[in-house]
Amino acid sequence: MWIKGKAYYEGEIKEICINFDRSIKEIRANCKPDMTFTNEELILPASVDLHVHVRGAQLSYKETVATATSEAVYGGVGVIVDMPNTVPYINTPERIKERLREFQLYSRTDYGIYSGVSKEVEEIDKLPIAGYKIYPEDLEKEETRYVLEKSKKLKILHPEMPFVSKIERSLRRSYWMETAAINLVKGNMHITHITNFETLQLAKSMGFTTDITAHHLVVDGERDCISKVNPPIRDYVTRLKLFLKGLFEVDCIASDHAPHSKEEKRMNFDLCPPGIAGVSFSTPYIYSLMFKGLISIDRAVSLLSGNPSRILNIPTGKIKEGYRANFTVIKRENWRYTTKFSKVTETPMDGFSLDAKVTNVIVEGKLAFDGENVYPIRGVNIFDSSSRS
């Protein structure tokens, strides 16, 4: 298949033709295209979200693989990586295989999964996973030592101390809860959903890769259960500093998409589960900043596609021959954010004014989203080398 249009290619915006099946075969100036995009549209590498809670399995009342990945392509995301804290918890070879089968049947994006920490690390390491997720409570477990010492795969850390769940939320506001946790880990480590600039500086100085979420930049405080999240939304000054400085030093943007049912989010604040569903917000938000002139296109593509692909070591994130044929097409258009395909219908970003609109998404060379509809394509496990042929 050939497509033609303006694209971000080799660090510039150029009018090009791209030939592909599941991977990009050829790029040249002229062709007889099967699909042509307008002058208002821009072809970009599809976004890669390395921190998503898909739910599914026994938590399908919150979200399913189909609804989460449909919401992802609506938001311009071509690869998601799923966290293990569903029910049942994913940290055995058998459960990993079951989880991968669930994705194989229902995912509209390319995908990967993390395992939880486990003493079965040698067997799990043989499976096509993205790596391991380390939660605060894991820092006290013997299984975590096994993972840190025996696996060379990526480890992704939720940077808070183990005892944070036992104290008042307001006391977690101090950034030392994050920095103290970072000092307990080593190796091929990624520090996720950082909420303040000091934590980011420390993580980078230790050679770790990093991400921040869009909601930790734009949401104005924890006003109710809809905006309750872990780690918590910080004060205005902390968020402003993270935006003004952190956005230019962090490696990537991740959504930490964490859906819950409407009934759960209507519980008393002390009882309702933390989590914001934002897998479809990150990409239009970052490209809106680009259209406003606040960040460059190079920086935007790096945050959403290039750097997460590098961190995960997967062949995405660039429009380049041999890379996966995963594209996000956007145009400049003002609109108000809302979820569309997720089971979650309320987020603290609802009504947020955006200037970038996703018009098309192609995953594995197939049209996954056309601006209105999501199509039942099947993504592949991007960490399984046999799926890349």
From Swiss-Prot:
GO BP annotations, alphabetical order: 'de novo' UMP biosynthetic process; purine nucleobase catabolic process
Binding site for Zn(2+) 2: 133, 158, 193
Pathway this chain belongs to: Pyrimidine metabolism; UMP biosynthesis via de novo pathway; (S)-dihydroorotate from bicarbonate: step 3/3
Annotated GO MF terms: allantoinase activity; dihydroorotase activity; zinc ion binding
Keyword Zinc: yes
Catalytic-site annotation from UniProt: 256
Keywords: Hydrolase, Metal-binding, Pyrimidine biosynthesis, Zinc
Cofactor binding summary note: Binds 2 Zn(2+) ions per subunit.
Similarity section: Belongs to the metallo-dependent hydrolases superfamily. DHOase family. Class I DHOase subfamily.
Protein's UniProt name: Dihydroorotase
Organism classification: Archaea, Thermoproteota, Thermoprotei, Sulfolobales, Sulfolobaceae
